[in-house]
Amino acid sequence: MTDAVGSIDMPDAQDEAPDSKKSRKGGKRGKKGPLKRLALFYRQIVADVRKVVWPSRNQLTTYTTVVIIFVVIMIGLVTLIDYGFSHAAKYVFG
């Protein structure tokens, strides 16, 4: 194999292990009951929500104002483009 930048390392034939020596995927993780998996999922959600950095009230007001102004500008832009296309269509098709 060449070690060029961006090349993919492909396994050679002698690198592959026979099927009898491969370990099973899943292991003990697949043996948990549905309630334990649901509890684990819930604990992971709570842990992730605790990591969230919530904006302050001032930041939230600023972000909301910026989004509303941007949406109003985009509505105006689309309205102008639509108005232009409608007049162009009336001019072309009579």
From Swiss-Prot:
Pfam families, A to Z: SecE
Biased composition, class Basic residues, residue ranges: 22-32
TM segment ranges: 65-85
Keyword vocabulary terms for this entry: Cell membrane, Membrane, Protein transport, Translocation, Transmembrane, Transmembrane helix, Transport
Keyword DNA repair: no
Membrane topology (UniProt): Single-pass membrane protein
Keyword check for Transmembrane helix: yes
Compartment(s) of residence: Cell membrane
GO annotation terms (biological process): intracellular protein transmembrane transport; protein secretion; protein targeting; protein transport by the Sec complex
Protein family according to the UniProt entry: Belongs to the SecE/SEC61-gamma family.
Subunit structure: Component of the Sec protein translocase complex. Heterotrimer consisting of SecY, SecE and SecG subunits. The heterotrimers can form oligomers, although 1 heterotrimer is thought to be able to translocate proteins. Interacts with the ribosome. Interacts with SecDF, and other proteins may be involved. Interacts with SecA.
Role of this protein: Essential subunit of the Sec protein translocation channel SecYEG. Clamps together the 2 halves of SecY. May contact the channel plug during translocation.
Protein name: Protein translocase subunit SecE
Gene giving rise to this polypeptide: secE
